[in-house]
C-alpha cells in the first residue's frame, strides 16, 4: 500500500511527523506538506504565482503553498502513480462542525477525494502535542481497518480525544455538529497608528447533541464523520423551480 500524507500545520509539525511514522510502519509513504502553518486556508489553490517544491533531509517534500496545493502537486507532478490512500494531519486542534469548511487539514484530504482517491483527515482535540503518539496510534488503527466493503472513494473526518491511548473509547460514526457564529474581530493598531484586525475566536458549540462529533469526543470516543462534496441544497430544489417558473 502507498499512502500520501499532508497537513496544514507545516512540514515540521509534530503531528505530521507522528502520523508519517505511524503510516511508515504499514505502508510506503510520500509526504508533501506546506512550508509553514496554513491553518484556515480551506480548499484554496495558489493561482497567482508559481510554486516551488523542496525536499527536507528526512525525505519530506515541502511547498510554499496551501494544503490543497500540496496534494494537487503531489498527485499531478511528484508521484508517478496515484496512492492507495491519502491521510492528512494530525492537526493540532479539533476540526468539528463548521470547522471543516475552513480547515486546511480537511481540505488536503478533500483534494485527494476530488481525484477519486480515498482520504482521511485526522485532528486531535484541543491544543498541545502531549498525546500525539496516542493519536498517531489511533490513526494507524483506523487505516488498518478493512474498508473493502465501504464505498470508494470515501472522505472521512476523524477527531481524536487528547487522551492517553488506554483512556480513549472506541471509534463511533458521527455527524457534524454546529457552532454559533464566530466572535467579533479583535481590533488593534500597528506602530504607525493604523487600524489592524485579527479574526476572532470561533463560536461555541450550538449543536453538540448525541450523534455529533462534539458529543462523541466529549465522552472520550474517537469521532469519524463521513463527508461529501456536493453542496446542493436538494430539499430546496423543487421550491426554487417553482419560483423560477
Swiss-Prot record:
EC number, UniProt record: 3.1.3.5
Keywords annotated in UniProt: Cytoplasm, Hydrolase, Metal-binding, Nucleotide-binding
Entry GO MF terms: 3'-nucleotidase activity; 5'-nucleotidase activity; exopolyphosphatase activity; metal ion binding; nucleotide binding
Residues the entry annotates as binding a divalent metal cation: 8-9, 39, 91
The keyword Nucleotide-binding is assigned to this record: yes
Reactions the enzyme catalyzes: a ribonucleoside 5'-phosphate + H2O = a ribonucleoside + phosphate
A single cellular component GO annotation: cytoplasm
Disulfide pattern: none
Cofactor note: Binds 1 divalent metal cation per subunit.
Compartment(s) where it occurs, according to its Swiss-Prot or TrEMBL record: Cytoplasm
Keyword Transport: no
Cofactor: a divalent metal cation
Domain of life (superkingdom): Bacteria
A Pfam match: SurE
Function: Nucleotidase that shows phosphatase activity on nucleoside 5'-monophosphates.
Family of this protein: Belongs to the SurE nucleotidase family.
Xref: NCBIfam families: PRK00346.1-3, PRK00346.1-4, surE
Protein name, UniProt field: 5'-nucleotidase SurE
Highest classification ranks of the organism: Bacteria, Pseudomonadati, Pseudomonadota, Betaproteobacteria, Burkholderiales
Gene name of the encoded protein: surE
Amino acid at each position: 500500500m502507498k499512502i500520501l500524507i499532508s497537513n496544514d500545520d507545516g512540514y515540521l509539525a509534530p503531528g505530521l511527523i507522528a502520523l508519517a511514522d505511524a503510516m511508515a510502519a504499514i505502508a510506503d509513504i510520500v509526504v508533501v506538506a506546506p512550508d509553514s502553518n496554513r491553518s484556515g486556508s480551506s480548499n484554496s489553490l495558489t493561482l497567482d504565482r508559481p510554486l516551488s517544491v523542496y525536499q527536507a533531509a528526512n525525505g519530506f517534500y515541502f511547498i510554499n503553498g496551501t494544503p490543497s496545493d500540496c496534494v494537487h502537486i503531489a498527485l499531478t507532478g511528484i508521484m508517478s502513480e496515484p496512492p492507495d490512500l491519502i491521510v492528512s494531519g494530525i492537526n493540532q486542534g479539533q476540526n468539528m462542525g463548521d470547522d471543516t469548511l475552513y480547515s486546511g487539514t480537511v481540505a488536503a484530504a478533500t483534494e485527494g477525494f476530488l481525484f477519486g482517491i480515498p482520504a482521511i483527515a485526522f485532528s486531535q482535540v484541543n491544543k498541545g502535542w502531549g498525546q500525539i503518539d496516542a493519536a498517531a496510534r489511533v490513526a494507524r488503527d483506523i487505516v488498518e481497518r478493512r474498508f473493502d466493503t465501504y464505498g470508494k472513494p470515501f472522505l472521512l473526518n476523524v477527531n481524536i480525544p487528547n487522551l492517553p491511548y488506554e483512556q480513549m473509547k472506541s471509534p463511533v460514526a458521527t455527524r457534524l455538529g454546529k457552532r454559533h457564529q464566530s466572535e467579533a474581530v479583535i481590533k488593534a493598531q500597528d506602530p504607525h497608528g493604523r487600524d489592524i484586525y485579527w479574526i476572532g475566536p470561533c463560536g461555541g458549540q450550538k449543536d453538540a447533541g448525541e450523534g455529533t462529533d462534539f458529543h462523541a469526543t466529549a465522552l472520550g470516543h474517537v469521532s469519524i464523520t463521513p463527508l461529501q462534496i456536493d453542496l446542493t441544497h436538494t430539499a430546496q430544489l423543487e421550491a426554487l423551480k417553482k419560483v423560477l417558473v
